[in-house]
Regions:
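C-terminal catalytic and target-recognition region of SAM-dependent MTase-like enzymes
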Residues: 178, 192-255
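S-adenosyl-L-methionine
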Residues: 112-156
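S-adenosylmethionine
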Residues: 138-214
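Conserved class I S-adenosyl-L-methionine
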Residues: 78-88
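Conserved SAM-binding motif I beta-strand of class I
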Residues: 103-108
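Conserved alpha-helix/loop element of class I SAM-dependent methyltransferases that forms part
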Residues: 63-80
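Non-catalytic substrate-recognition/targeting regions of SAM-dependent transferases
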Residues: 1-62, 70
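Conserved SAM-binding loop of SAM-dependent methyltransferases across substrates and taxa
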Residues: 89-101
Length: 255
């Protein structure tokens, strides 16, 4: 810690995240300097996000997705209805709303997603009326939306690499194709799918193949218009390509 403080003397305050299993240490703890206010409001692409630096491993926003959120803020979602699956704190939804989306729907199984997402809209002074925040299993919501005849101009998929609940075990490597197929069922006839994963054990080539296979099985016309990986300020060791874990595809789909 002495060496860190010597190299980075301008750090106002520091928190530690414990990413290995331990019985004696918390996932997160304050180390030195000034403690951040809660929430700590950070600004990205002109959008404010409420973050909590000492709330477990996650802070409320994943900075590696800033370029994708920037596209949404810059008008990619203007005039569109947006469905944000595995929405966490709703960062994609807020970015889309700030960029002119007419309505957003955020779906996540975690109960905390409701107050967390509401807060993100509120700190940006956005009207909550056209923003739906739903606590539900994503696969159950696909069935619900299909049964109710709901459809969306844009669907964002950003699942965890692995997740488990009472009904299902999900892994990107085995189940991502299901997400793509279910999305197509409730996408408008000419819609956009933003497909994302942070699975480090899956190369970009294999990920693209997985997504394309699902699209072909649904017999739709599609075009991958943009591909994103980690932003330039996220260092990647060329000898460890798995470190460039983020993979995001922008796909235009016509049914």
């Amino acid at each position: 810690m002495t060496a860190f403080r010597t190299v980075y003397p301008d750090i106002i305050g520091a928190y530690e995240k414990i990413r290995f299993s331990t019985k004696n240490l918390p996932e997160s703890q304050f180390l030195y300097g000034e403690q951040a206010p809660e929430p700590l409001l950070v600004t990205e692409n002109g959008v404010q996000f409420a973050t909590y630096l000492n709330e477990g491993l996650m802070t409320g926003i994943f900075l590696d997705q800033k370029e994708v959120r920037g596209r949404l803020v810059d008008g990619f979602a203007v005039g569109k209805t947006v469905l944000n699956m595995f929405s966490y704190t709703g960062a994609f939804s807020v970015a889309a709303a700030m960029g002119g989306a007419v309505a957003t729907t955020s779906v996540d199984l975690a109960k905390r997603s409701l107050p967390k997402t509401t807060e993100q809209f509120e700190v940006n002074h956005l009207n909550l009326a056209p923003q739906k925040i739903i606590v539900m299993d994503v696969f159950d919501y696909f069935k619900y939306a299909s049964r109710k005849g709901l459809s969306y101009d844009m669907i964002i998929l950003d699942p965890p690499s692995f997740a488990r609940n009472k009904k299902k075990v999900f892994s990107v490597a085995k189940n991502y194709g299901e997400l793509v197929k279910d999305s197509i069922d409730i996408l408008t006839d000419k819609g956009t799918l933003i497909a994302s994963t942070n699975a480090a054990n899956l190369s970009l080539a294999k990920y693209k193949k997985m997504v394309i296979t699902a699209l072909q099985e649904k017999n739709v016309r599609y075009k991958i218009t943009d591909t994103y990986q980690l932003p330039a300020d996220f260092q990647v060791n060329p000898n460890f390509p798995e470190g460039n874990y983020l993979k995001v595809l922008f796909i235009e789909i016509e049914k």
